[in-house]
Amino acid sequence: MNWDRIEGNWKQLKGKVREQWGRLTDDELDKIAGHRDTLVGSLQNSYGIAKDEAEKQIKEFEARCERDKWVQ
C-alpha cells in the first residue's frame, strides 16, 4: 500500500493507529499527522524498540489497512 493513502486519511485512521499502538497519546498522533518517519520515531520512543522493528510493525499495519479496506 502507498503510505500517501494512509497519510491522506490520517484523521479517519487515528483510531485504528491507537488500537494498534495504545501507548501513543492523542497529542503524539496529532504531531505524527500521518508522517511515516515521525511515526517510526514515536514508536521507538514509546515502546523502546529498534527502528527495524518499528518499520516492521508499520508494514504490518499497512497490510492490515489494505486487507481490511480501511483506506480506499
Label each residue range with its predicted role.
Residues 1-72:
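Intrinsically disordered, low-complexity, hydrophilic segments
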